[in-house]
């Protein structure tokens, strides 16, 4: 639509004393209702917009009948004149183009399209008028007519950047910054296909090798590079050495952790095996100890039984021997007493010879229990010695008789055995 022609029509409308409808301006309102593009400023077509709005409301009231029934109790009833004045007052107070201009132009150009009653039409107009945000005309800056607007929603066309027309929240609101788009898609090769993962891995490995080789270069190589690229070669070399030291530390720590894990696992397995072996060996030892204890107890019992039997046998053997010794000692005492009384005149030499004969005969007869016999013999010797000292001299005849009696006494225990 020609903007110059539109401006001339608006000037003619203002110059006329009697306000009438202009087909050129009606065509402009239809264009705004279809596209949402306001090619001129609000101050230029504000007068005709208010005139058209008032005329449409009056025509709608004359053409539409009054409601026959009572008004809806849930809705506040407002008279037509009061609602009309309220709407016109709001539109007159606008300083810019309301962002609902497209919908308002639709209501002005075709009021009966969606409404049949006057009160509903007025409420629809009031809802679209009671707004705050404003928009600028599309041709005001950059003369860009590529932005399309449908029902308050902006549809950018071929222009890559936003303009003043796209700021639907008014002139004072901040606008988004123009930032370059970052493509998140995979890089495309020359044939149009995305790169494969193998090629990516190969590139990564090459980059790592390059970085490693660069870091491992000596200070002399770094200093040989042009001074424009590397202003501080010493610092770069120190940083490279620090990176290498860190890598070596990480590698050593990883190896130490792996070896520690392996050693711990081996220790655990060996400990488990050792426990099983110790348990089995302890069981075997317990069995062996039990067997040895049983054998030892059996042997001890057998030895105890044998000792008891031996002691019993020896006690049996010792009892008659002791009895015989006691009898012999008693007989000897009685014989010695008798001989001492009868033969007081026996000589000491004869007595000693008789005692020797007695001892020799007793030793040949009793060889087993030597200790007891010897003790008894010593007692008899002492008694005989005491008796011999008391008696004095003994005759040779009495000594011969004593020899015969002694032989008889020694024969008696042999007969008992």
From Swiss-Prot:
Keyword set includes Phosphoprotein: yes
Ranges of Basic and acidic residues composition bias in the record: 197-213, 231-258, 283-297, 318-327, 353-363
Record InterPro entries: PPP4R2 (IPR015267)
Keywords: Cytoplasm, Cytoskeleton, mRNA processing, mRNA splicing, Nucleus, Phosphoprotein
Lineage: superkingdom: Eukaryota
GO CC term (a single one): nucleus
Compositional bias per record (Acidic residues), positions renumbered to this chain: 298-311, 338-350, 400-417
Assembly, per entry: Serine/threonine-protein phosphatase 4 (PP4) occurs in different assemblies of the catalytic and one or more regulatory subunits. Component of the PP4 complexes PPP4C-PPP4R2, PPP4C-PPP4R2-PPP4R3A and PPP4C-PPP4R2-PPP4R3B. The PPP4C-PPP4R2 complex appears to be a tetramer composed of 2 molecules of PPP4C and 2 molecules of PPP4R2. Interacts with DDX20/GEMIN3 and GEMIN4. Interacts with RPA2; this DNA damage-dependent interaction recruits PPP4C leading to RPA2 dephosphorylation.
Protein name stated in the entry: Serine/threonine-protein phosphatase 4 regulatory subunit 2
Organism: Pongo abelii
